[in-house]
Amino acid sequence: MEYISFEHNNIAADLVKQAYDTPPLAFVHSYGCQQNVNDGERIKGVLVDIGYGLCDKPEDADLILFNTCAVREHAEQRVFGNVGALKGLKEKKPGLIIGLCGCMANQKHVVEKLRQSYPYVDLVFGVDGIDTLPQLIAQKLQKHKRVLLDPAQRPVIVENIPIRRESEFRAWLPIMYGCDNFCTYCIVPYVRGREKSRKPGDILAEFRGLVEAGYKEITLLGQNVNSYGKGLEEQIDFSDLLNLLCTVPGDYHIRFMTSHPKDASHKLID
């Protein structure tokens, strides 16, 4: 597992500034679980970092991103319907950049459908590609061609991605990504990948920053938080992590989701 830190992309920021007469606006809509909501907050943070403002209506935007969910077929159909509804807007605003990311973008048949049937979709990238968004936008602005990445899972965790949190009271804090359980009914391991745990020091630093910023309810996120720590060099499990976070002074509540009962230990229960 490789751990890297997000870096500001000066080239992308300069290209964004040059491409628009007025400061550009981005509309980001996230579907699905809390992990997707948190990913959406980080996507917004990355966009602001390279010069975009944020807006609440797609018709006001210079860039539209749908951060998608693949757990239910109905959610996928909603996304395709919403993407299809943008065709007319794209015709009115040829410079509009339309993108799709998230779990749906980690499925080959979805990427191929977008490639063949939605020629006005400009950007496609998966759940592991948030940190590459500035590079993809720069490529689109430079070459004026579609940038549709084939599904791929990166054995990497990127720290310090900028974030624009939606609440000043509640905060999401990912501690791990992916799942190794491969339940018959669930697509998560195939689109989110195998389990990857963040280093405890990085989690603690982000947690302390949230407490110091005044957040009162902090929810630890993972597809299976009970299996936190597997694969780390440091011997630590989820109960150890909870004890570590509770050493931070302050007035706050810790919540977590989601968990698998087979990984719930007596140590955690105690």
Question: Positions of the model-derived regions?
Answer:
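Conserved SAM/AdoMet-binding glycine-rich loop
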Residues: 98-100, 107-109, 212-270
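Proteins enriched for Cys/Gly/acidic motifs involved in redox and nucleic-acid/cofactor modification
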Residues: 1-228
